């Protein structure tokens, strides 16, 4: 998946209703300026999740090192985030690198059923789009 395709998907899902597309372009630009030019399906899914939520976007530098393609797992489970934001972020992390937790309790938190049950309608749509992005042909 290239950056243009990801931006088109975001445009189709969000249009001009929010700033998702602008935030997504900023994340992709920041990533490429940091020397990481790879926008693959895994990157695309988590970038979309982060761009789709204003709070996650505002905190992305503490969550993800775009230049090194790394996630700070400790920040994902920060109590600063709402249960819905944590659920979206956990889904993004799982789609990015398959992470399912280090303990049985964490594994439950990363379970797709548990994630989807914590999301409202808007965030469920974001989650479904992220899954489509990750597993698209």
Question: Which positions does each model-derived feature cover?
Answer:
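Extended, charge-biased low-complexity segments
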Residues: 1-81, 97-137
């Amino acid at each position: 998946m290239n950056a243009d395709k990801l931006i088109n998907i975001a445009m189709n899902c969000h249009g001009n209703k929010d700033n998702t597309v602008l935030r997504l372009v900023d994340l992709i630009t920041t990533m490429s300026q940091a020397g990481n030019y790879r926008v693959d399906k895994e990157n695309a899914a988590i970038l979309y999740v982060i761009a789709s939520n204003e709070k996650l976007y505002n905190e992305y530098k503490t969550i993800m090192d775009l230049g090194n393609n790394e996630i700070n797992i400790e920040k994902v489970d920060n109590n600063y985030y709402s249960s819905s934001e944590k659920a979206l972020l956990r889904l993004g992390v799982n789609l990015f690198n398959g992470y399912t937790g280090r303990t049985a309790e964490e594994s439950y938190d990363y379970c797709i059923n548990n994630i989807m049950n914590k999301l409202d309608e808007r965030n469920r749509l974001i989650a479904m789009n992220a899954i489509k992005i990750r597993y698209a042909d």
